[in-house]
Amino acid sequence: RFVSTLAQLNPDINYVGIEKYSSVLLRAVEKQDELNLPNLRFIRMDAEAITEVFDRGEVDRIYLNFSDPWPKDRHAKRRLTSRQFFERYNIILKKDGQVEFKTDNRPLFDFSVEEVKEAGWQLRAVTYDLHNDAKLCEGNVMTEYEERFSAAGNPICKLIAVR
């Protein structure tokens, strides 16, 4: 729903949703068909191959919403906010591109803040309670997970990273 809402609000901007799992992707494609959004496409793929799909400097912004936390330390490089992934994002993002990340998982968020720095990126904005941060919450498009976790009383963390 997140990317569908963005596509509806910004018909002159193209969006590409990437999803690893077919079951999740199927629901998104059905929603896209229902809403008739010509500026929205989906790709089923593992994000590790992102540089094989997008050209250097092709992408304006990357949204990472409630990603799998891969809680075991040995799986840290699989996290979409690891420095290994920021190396990939560095290739496909335009010079002034940015990465926006939201989660309710505080350990993952703390890891991500450190990885942004270790990757040589800068934090443009950081909040540990998005819905009580008037500046960062302005224009926030909520995901289904965000609604669920927020309703359960979990604060939502958000960062915006730039090169």
Report each predicted region and the residues it spans.
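Conserved SAM-binding loop of SAM-dependent methyltransferases across substrates and taxa
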Residues: 1-12
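Conserved beta-strand positions in the Rossmann-like core of class I SAM-dependent methyltransferases
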Residues: 16
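Conserved SAM/SAH-binding beta-strand->alpha-helix loop
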Residues: 21
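S-adenosyl-L-methionine
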Residues: 28-61
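A short SAM/SAH-binding and catalytic strip from SAM-dependent methyltransferases
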Residues: 53, 59-80
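Conserved class I S-adenosyl-L-methionine
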Residues: 71-76, 98-119
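A short glycine-rich, Lys/Arg-flanked "PGG" loop and its adjoining helix->strand segment in the class I
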Residues: 79-98
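Class I S-adenosyl-L-methionine
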Residues: 112-163
